[in-house]
Amino acid sequence: FKQSVRIVEVLEKKGQGLNLTKEVRDGILNHRTSGNPATLEGKIVRFSDKIAYINHDIDDAIRGKIITEKDIPREFADVLGDTVKDRLNIMIHDIINNSMDKPSIFMSPDVERAMRGMREWMFEHVYRNPAAKGEEGRAQQLIVTLYEYYLKHVDELPEEFRMMMETRGEKKERVVCDYI
């Protein structure tokens, strides 16, 4: 997630970076389960990220025919809802209702338990599914191929990336990663 901060602080606006507050940078750095956001904004980003990922991943898995809506366990759908719209509505309102007038951001135990259970179910049935793993392998190979190509052909990078090497002394490996 350091790359996410690098993008907003160094790469955005053609190398000028964005003038973000400490709270927003904290949210970006600590939006995954491994980080511990120090600010309310960071905690909101963490919850938002979890909600977005689970719903997008369910939607992607259904469109990719890895699962169907009927495959989703009732114990989770009964709490979180049957559609993306329902799940978003329930989770967002649950956070609002459980965080109002409190010093931190909370989700009710039932909704949090269902969301955690849904995530575990997704790991078993989607993320570790051979079809999904095959796509992951192809995506990784594509990134490696692009990386190796641009290391040999830095002259084909957009000018703003080539300039990072010339004016800032950035190493080509770093610039190629930034571009990809």
Where are the model-predicted features located?
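Histidine-centered, transition-metal-coordinating active-site segments
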Residues: 2-179
